[in-house]
């Protein structure tokens, strides 16, 4: 799935669109996508100018955006729905992510009850687990 289809599924836009491509999707189960980290991203002007490091919170946001894509594809559409992050749990960051890295993000649906979905996600760089997190999202009708 390319960036055009991604932009049709989730509302995020530059500079906050943090998924570049979806490589695999197994509806109602899991999704694998990538984020190419480049020095031109605005967070690197202040985090940190001498040694740019991808903020952990943005890695978690990329995981959550991938989850929103999985929800949209699994439901068939989210045009009349919104996906909101409710909780973030057990986030761990094991390695620095910097410009030039490609984040391979794997997100799995752990549980789904009514409009509350639970996920677990990992980020790998060159096959090495770099970050992981569990989070919960709520799917609501648009107002």
Curated annotation (Swiss-Prot):
Q: Which residues form the active site?
A: 47
Where is coiled-coil annotated?
A: none
Query: Biological process GO annotation list?
Result: fatty acid biosynthetic process; lipid A biosynthetic process
What does the record give as EC number? 4.2.1.59
Q: Which reaction does it catalyse?
A: a (3R)-hydroxyacyl-[ACP] = a (2E)-enoyl-[ACP] + H2O
SUPFAM superfamilies recorded: Thioesterase/thiol ester dehydrase-isomerase
The record's GO CC annotations read: cytoplasm; membrane
Spell out the molecular function terms from Gene Ontology.
(3R)-hydroxyacyl-[acyl-carrier-protein] dehydratase activity
**One Pfam family of this chain:** FabA
Annotated localization: Cytoplasm
Which terms are listed as keywords in the entry?
Cytoplasm, Lipid A biosynthesis, Lipid biosynthesis, Lipid metabolism, Lyase
Question: NCBIfam families per the record?
Answer: fabZ, PRK00006.1
Its job: Involved in unsaturated fatty acids biosynthesis. Catalyzes the dehydration of short chain beta-hydroxyacyl-ACPs and long chain saturated and unsaturated beta-hydroxyacyl-ACPs.
Q: Which HAMAP family match?
A: FabZ (MF_00406)
Q: What is stated as this protein's family in its record? A: Belongs to the thioester dehydratase family. FabZ subfamily.
User: Could you identify this protein by its name?
Assistant: 3-hydroxyacyl-[acyl-carrier-protein] dehydratase FabZ
Question: Which organism does this record belong to?
Answer: Rickettsia canadensis (strain McKiel)
Q: What gene is this protein a product of?
A: fabZ
């Amino acid at each position: 799935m390319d960036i055009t289809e991604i932009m049709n599924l989730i509302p995020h836009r530059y500079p906050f669109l943090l998924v570049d491509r979806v490589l695999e999707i197994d509806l109602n189960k899991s999704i694998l996508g990538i984020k190419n980290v480049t020095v031109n991203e605005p967070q690197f002007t202040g985090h940190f100018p001498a040694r740019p490091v991808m903020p952990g919170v943005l890695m978690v946001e990329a995981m959550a955006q991938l989850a929103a894509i999985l929800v949209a594809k699994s439901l068939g559409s989210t045009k009349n729905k919104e996906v909101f992050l409710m909780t973030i749990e057990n986030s761990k960051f094991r390695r620095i992510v910097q410009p030039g890295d490609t984040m391979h993000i794997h997100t799995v649906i752990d549980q789904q009850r009514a409009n509350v979905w639970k996920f677990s996600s990992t980020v790998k760089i060159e096959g090495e687990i770099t970050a992981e997190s569990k989070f919960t999202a709520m799917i609501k009708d648009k107002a």
